[in-house]
């Protein structure tokens, strides 16, 4: 039942309270002469005076004895009513009837201390045994009344009740003015004493109005007289007001489509006090927006009040629906909440009236009308044609701006003559291809090829005998021959038309009526009747014209030059054939010898239509369709790839399982020799026993003089890329015993890029050994490797290494050094595959693009050099195939490269990840935007809107929100913006307290680190301590506050300087508060209560960020925040806005993208925005949010310097290293450079590429960071440089490059 408070607007009686403010005893003396004696008097004496006293109960009152003064002689005195009250006899003590009563000795007045209402009476004072008093004393003592009787409920409705009660038993000498009625809501509620009801009169009846339906009430009554309020009566018996239809609306939280025919709606119920009856459930009504009649409305009743979501099915495709949700109780329905939701695009129906308009030998022109049911926004039409079971796709035809039922035409060209084609046309939307319409058509014939003339001789002096062979190529039949001849003295030909028979191979005829001793030119061509229009004759090509002089017994005129060319050509062909046969013989012999020596195991399938096995990888065309395990698989157009991947995902990824099993099955059947890997001297060079290098594709190290042959071995294989043989070298993570071999391979193969996709240790197991120097230079055999710089980013690190061959001859000294770049991906999880493919795609693109065109292969390794290595190589090849051909063949390429190194793409999970990553790559396209192109995209609404839709496409499931949706945590959330389970920030849990590890906060990555930011809502009063617990637990020393505190919903959650805040484990106090450039900076210290540890925290409050009117201030604020963070780079930056949404995430985005722009002059807005959405869905509400990020980036100043203080690196020589505190760092580094009180050195520095460009000795050492170098000289010329160490650059080292002393403010040496 409802327990809502009583309506404040209920009607009440007019307030007529009586009030007496008695500050002392009120005595009213009235002396009057009465003509008749009162019936209650003790003395029935006429005309006796009466003295009246009126008193208030609880106060003192004194009655004077009439006629007695201080000078009166009193022997006896008696005060009495109906009984004696006090008595006095001369010489004795006064006698009184009550301890409250005193007989005053001065004038024998009767004193009551205090007086009660029961003391009301008529008193007489008899002196010296008189029979009658001088006057009667009338005492009236007034008091608050007794409580009325229990109120009774006479009748009631949903909002009123009629009450009646018994009057008070004793009004206590003061009439009842009115009554006060107090109300209680619920069986155990509080009485409403602050705002009770007042009656207008002293009637014992009242109608209470303004009640809440279906609510438990009880009442009590208080009587009111001039003296005040009586005690409350007994409360009435409980009753429940009648029901009414609900007044509250549900609140819609989610409304989106789930398919082309269904939508999903979720809601929160209205407040319980608005249900006004038993909560029976919900009614959902819906209709298409464009259909406004009541007949079209459909309804669904959900008779379960706990349900808060529903999916509506069987809707029309791509249609806007108005859906209304109402609660209902037994009295009826509440007001509706209406939401507009649209079903998804579906499959368009068949195009109408597909037919053939025109046909030629190489073209077919078709026409059609748009489908009857569009089921979406038609983007265009795809035209396929099938020939000999091979399907080909013509380019999509974009939809023209035409009226409904417009006619489309399209011409298929480059077809083969006289060939049957099945033509398929299907409309397509953004998401689906529609149902196809089909038509079959045979192309027309083309003209026959030229006949071959075999005879031209004189038949007589007036006739020629002319013979020819049937054309080598013709279609259907040859119906006619046309012989053309002319006298060379005339330019015009004469034609003779013969009916032909295709079954006759050689035809001869006599050309009559010629002139003797004339030269004639004769040629012939065939002709065929069109199969489309039999009346049309299609002419073929002419034979080569032949010349002859007509005379008796003549011969064909020789043509020396042409004949000579023909003979020379024949000789060349003959010579080429002989040479080719000889070369082929050598190849066969070489192959047999090689097979005998190395036992190569190449096999070829006997069935020509099927694919060659993967064991012929060097010979097969992996881009062509082929049949494997009874299924034909081939390249897939990019427009079809997402649909293809979705089909593989159905039924628990069964399609992927089948494909991967087919690849695995081939690998088991193929046996490639790997004798060098199995050699006893080489087994120790293999990290894993079962991961070996095939002999036919392995990398051979160059022979060192005097070295055994097997010492040319390294566990590495050449692997082809897309249309580039030996594009990669796949290898294992180097072992300590193979470091020298690894670097020899890098040198000999002219490698410029090394790709590493593993961490050194994963899940406690050694995956790879550190084969590069941590600082300075190391020797690995004959190769010296020096670490030049190290750029650490969130998901990968780029190291610049200088390698030098120490054994090259002096004349080649200039070629003995070169730079190698190691791209080290650090975010591949220990188990499985990455959460999202975007960082991997970006890494693949960046690392492969860095390889110079004249460099050797890219070396790729993980731990074994097969799983992640194969994934990387397949992704690169497919991205290039997409760019080149607009299609891709993952299955075929993986089969192909598995013949070059075993186990590439080691798990089915990796195989699935490749497909999902390529779908993302196709959908998103190129997302790295160059700096000079950002401004042009701000007004490209279509581009930004498309990005926004892709960015926000992910919708979390309830399992992803387990902690956030728990009832114990629901009160900690301000809005529907809540953290996902995989990215939420955890607090230290309190034993036995459910939900104590929860706070509405999410981890977000930045440019440098995966956990660079914590985004959270403005704390609620219930979560103040949780917020500071998070800061304490995660060592967060920088807080950015983008919301402002008010006195209503968003309260101040930090302590003032005079009032510290305490928790069970720590104490927070404010140290200072200052204003800087439109923002406030506060410094806090959090001290541990249990041990000697404290944490300094700085808060930057800037509720006006971003100030679009002053773009420079946007970046200055970000720089200021990151400067502070650079001083104490242990924990994340905590970013707070009202709901942990757009503003906070925008700050993180802008900060990270500004660093990326400084680093490589590109910005990947799409990647940051999408990964942020995937960790905290709902932060981007419209495409304008994304557009504003582009707009802010377009204002970025070139001299920002945001990267300068985030990380300092240097090349190390033989300098001594000592640890420095963050305070020393802040003294040395300010705003990204060495502080001015440390003098800059003058020596050599770095060029823009981080390579030392000078040779100074006492000057600045090369430092990397902003691309320039600075060193500081201190005290007696010593030089100091600073380096950030540690996995997250959270250790600071100071390097003293000379023997001079370094004086520090701290106690360090």
Swiss-Prot record:
Topological domains annotated Extracellular: 37-572
Membrane association type: Single-pass type I membrane protein
Gene null: resulting phenotype: (Microbial infection) RNAi-mediated knockdown results in reduced West Nile virus infection levels. Reduced ability of C-type lectin mosGCTL-1 to facilitate West Nile virus infection, indicating possible role of the protein as a receptor for C-type lectin mosGCTL-1.
Transmembrane portions of the chain: 573-593
Gene Ontology terms: biological process: anatomical structure morphogenesis; neuron development
Record key words, sorted: Cell membrane, Glycoprotein, Hydrolase, Membrane, Protein phosphatase, Signal, Transmembrane, Transmembrane helix
UniProt-annotated location(s): Cell membrane
All residue ranges annotated as the Fibronectin type-III domain in the record: 147-244, 249-347, 350-449, 450-553
Chain segments carrying region Disordered: 1239-1269
Primary site of residence: membrane
Reactions catalysed: O-phospho-L-tyrosyl-[protein] + H2O = L-tyrosyl-[protein] + phosphate
Quaternary organization: Interacts with C-type lectin mosGCTL-1; the interaction probably mediates the recruitment of West Nile virus particles in complex with C-type lectin mosGCTL-1 to the cell surface. Interacts with C-type lectin mosGCTL-7; the interaction probably mediates the recruitment of Japanese encephalitis virus particles in complex with C-type lectin mosGCTL-7 to the cell surface.
Protein name according to UniProt: Putative receptor-type tyrosine-protein phosphatase mosPTP-1
Species, as recorded: Aedes aegypti
């Amino acid at each position: 039942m409802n327990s809502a408070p009583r309506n404040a607007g209920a009607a009440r009686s007019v307030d007529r309270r009586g009030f007496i403010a008695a500050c002392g005893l009120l005595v009213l003396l009235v002396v009057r002469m009465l003509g008749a004696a009162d019936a209650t008097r003790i003395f029935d004496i006429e005309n006796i005076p009466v003295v009246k006293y009126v008193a208030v109960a609880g106060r003192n009152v004194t009655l004077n004895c009439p006629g007695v003064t201080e000078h009166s002689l009193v022997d006896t005195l008696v005060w009495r009513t109906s009984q004696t009250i006090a008595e006095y006899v001369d010489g004795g003590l006064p006698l009184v009837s009550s301890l409250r009563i005193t007989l005053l000795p001065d004038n024998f007045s009767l004193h009551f201390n205090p007086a009660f209402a029961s003391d009301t009476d008529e008193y007489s004072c008899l002196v010296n045994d008189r029979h009658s008093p001088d006057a009667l004393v009338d005492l009236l003592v007034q008091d608050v009344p007794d409580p009325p009787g229990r109120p009774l409920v006479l009748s009631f409705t949903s909002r009123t009740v009629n009450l009646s009660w018994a009057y008070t038993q004793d009004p206590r000498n003061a009439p009842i003015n009115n009554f006060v009625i107090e109300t209680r809501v619920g069986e155990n509620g509080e009485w409403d004493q602050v705002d009770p009801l007042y009656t207008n009169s002293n009637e014992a009846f009242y109608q209470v109005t303004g009640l809440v339906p279906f609510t438990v009430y009880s009442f009590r009554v208080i009587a009111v007289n001039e003296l005040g309020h009586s005690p409350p009566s007994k409360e009435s018996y409980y009753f429940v007001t009648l029901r009414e239809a609900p007044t509250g609306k549900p609140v819609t939280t989610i409304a989106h489509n789930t398919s082309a025919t269904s939508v999903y709606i979720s809601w929160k119920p209205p407040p319980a006090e608005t249900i006004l009856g038993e909560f029976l459930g919900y009614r959902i009504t819906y209709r298409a927006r464009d259909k406004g009649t009541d007949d079209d409305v459909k309804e669904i009743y959900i008779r379960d009040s706990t349900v808060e979501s529903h999916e509506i099915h069987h809707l029309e495709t791509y249609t806007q629906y108005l859906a209304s949700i109402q609660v209902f109780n037994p009295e009826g329905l509440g007001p509706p909440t209406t939401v507009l939701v649209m079903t998804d695009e579906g499959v368009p129906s068949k195009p109408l009236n597909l037919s053939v308009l025109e046909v030629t030998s190489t073209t077919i022109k078709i026409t059609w009308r748009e489908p009857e049911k569009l089921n979406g926004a038609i983007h265009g039409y795809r035209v396929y044609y099938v020939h000999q079971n091979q399907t080909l796709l013509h380019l999509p035809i974009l939809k023209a701006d035409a009226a409904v039922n417009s006619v489309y035409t399209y011409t298929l060209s480059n077809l083969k003559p006289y060939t049957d084609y099945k033509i398929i046309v299907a409309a397509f939307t953004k998401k689906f291809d529609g149902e196809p319409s089909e038509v079959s058509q045979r192309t027309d014939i083309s003209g026959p090829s030229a006949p071959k003339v075999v005879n031209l001789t004189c038949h007589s002096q007036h006739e020629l005998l002319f013979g020819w062979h049937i054309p080598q190529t013709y279609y259907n039949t040859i119906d006619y021959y046309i012989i053309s001849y002319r006298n060379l003295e005339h330019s015009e030909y004469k034609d003779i038309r013969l009916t032909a028979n295709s079954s006759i191979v050689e035809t001869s005829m006599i050309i009559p009526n010629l002139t003797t001793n004339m030269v004639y030119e004769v040629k012939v061509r065939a002709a065929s009747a069109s199969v489309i229009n039999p009346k049309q004759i299609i002419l073929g090509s002419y034979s080569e014209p032949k010349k002859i002089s007509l005379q008796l017994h003549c011969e064909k005129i020789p043509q020396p030059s042409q004949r000579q060319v023909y003979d020379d050509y024949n000789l060349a062909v003959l010579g080429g054939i002989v040479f080719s046969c000889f070369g082929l013989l050598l190849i066969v012999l070489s192959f047999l010898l090689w097979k005998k020596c190395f036992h190569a195991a190449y096999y070829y399938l006997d069935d020509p239509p099927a694919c060659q096995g993967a064991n012929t990888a060097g010979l097969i065309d992996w881009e062509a369709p082929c049949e494997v395990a009874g299924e034909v698989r081939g390249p897939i157009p990019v427009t079809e790839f997402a649909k293809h991947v979705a089909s593989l995902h159905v039924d628990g990824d069964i399609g992927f399982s089948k494909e991967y099993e087919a690849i695995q099955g081939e690998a088991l059947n193929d046996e490639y020799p790997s004798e060098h890997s199995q050699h006893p001297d080489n087994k120790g060079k293999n990290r894993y026993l079962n991961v070996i290098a095939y002999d036919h594709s392995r990398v051979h190290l160059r022979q060192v003089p005097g070295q055994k042959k097997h010492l040319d071995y390294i566990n590495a294989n050449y692997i082809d890329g897309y249309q580039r043989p030996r594009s990669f070298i796949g290898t294992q993570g180097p072992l300590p015993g193979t470091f020298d071999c690894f670097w020899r391979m890098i040198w000999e193969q002219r490698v410029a890029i090394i790709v590493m996709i593993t961490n050194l240790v994963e899940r406690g197991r050694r995956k790879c050994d550190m084969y590069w120097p941590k600082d300075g230079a190391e020797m690995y055999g004959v190769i010296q490797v020096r670490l030049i710089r190290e750029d650490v980013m969130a998901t990968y690190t780029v190291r610049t290494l200088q390698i030098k061959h120490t054994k090259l001859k002096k004349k080649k000294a200039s070629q003995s050094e070169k730079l190698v770049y190691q791209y080290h991906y650090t975010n591949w999880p220990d188990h499985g595959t990455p959460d999202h493919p975007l960082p991997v795609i970006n890494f693949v693109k960046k690392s492969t693009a860095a390889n110079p065109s004249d460099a050797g292969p890219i070396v790729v390794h993980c731990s074994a050099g097969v799983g992640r290595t194969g994934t990387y190589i397949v992704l690169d090849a497919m991205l290039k195939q997409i760019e080149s051909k607009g299609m891709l063949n993952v299955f075929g390429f993986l089969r192909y490269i598995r013949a070059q190194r075993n186990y590439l793409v080691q798990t089915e999970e990796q195989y699935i990840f490749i497909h999902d990553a390529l779908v993302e790559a196709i959908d998103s396209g190129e997302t790295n935007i160059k700096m000079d192109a950002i401004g042009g995209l701000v007004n490209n609404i279509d581009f930004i809107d498309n990005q926004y839709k892709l960015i926000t496409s992910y919708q979390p499931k309830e399992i992803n929100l387990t902690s956030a949706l728990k009832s114990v945590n629901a009160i900690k959330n301000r809005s529907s913006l809540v953290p996902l389970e995989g990215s939420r920030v955890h607090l230290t849990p309190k034993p036995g307290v459910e939900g104590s590890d929860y706070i509405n906060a999410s981890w977000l990555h930045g440019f440098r680190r995966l956990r660079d930011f914590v985004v959270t809502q403005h704390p609620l009063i219930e979560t103040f301590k949780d917020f500071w617990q998070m800061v304490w637990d995660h060592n967060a020393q920088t807080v950015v506050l983008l919301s402002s505190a008010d006195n209503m919903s968003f309260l101040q959650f930090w302590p003032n300087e005079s009032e510290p805040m305490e928790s069970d484990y720590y104490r927070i106090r404010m140290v200072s508060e200052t204003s800087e450039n439109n923002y406030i900076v506060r410094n806090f210290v959090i001290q541990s209560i249990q041990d000697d540890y404290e944490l300094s925290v700085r808060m930057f409050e800037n509720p006006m960020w971003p100030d679009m009117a002053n773009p420079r201030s946007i970046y200055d604020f970000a720089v200021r925040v990151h400067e502070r963070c650079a001083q104490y780079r242990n924990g994340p930056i905590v970013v707070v806005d009202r709901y942990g949404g757009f503003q906070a995430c925008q700050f993180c985005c802008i900060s990270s993208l500004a660093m990326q722009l400084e680093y490589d002059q590109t910005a990947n807005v799409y990647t940051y925005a999408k990964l942020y959405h995937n960790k905290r869905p709902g932060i981007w509400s419209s495409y304008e949010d994304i557009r504003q990020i582009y707009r802010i980036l377009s204002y970025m100043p070139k001299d920002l310097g945001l990267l300068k203080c985030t990380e300092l690196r240097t090349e190390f020589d033989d300098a001594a290293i000592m640890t420095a505190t963050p305070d020393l760092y802040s003294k040395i580094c300010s705003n990204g450079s060495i502080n001015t009180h440390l003098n800059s050195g003058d020596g050599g520095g770095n060029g823009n590429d981080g390579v030392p460009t000078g040779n100074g000795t006492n000057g600045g050492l090369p430092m990397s960071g902003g691309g320039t170098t600075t060193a500081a000289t201190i005290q007696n010329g010593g030089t100091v440089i600073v380096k950030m160490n540690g996995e997250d650059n959270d250790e600071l080292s100071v390097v003293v490059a000379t023997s001079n002393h370094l004086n520090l403010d701290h106690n360090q040496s």
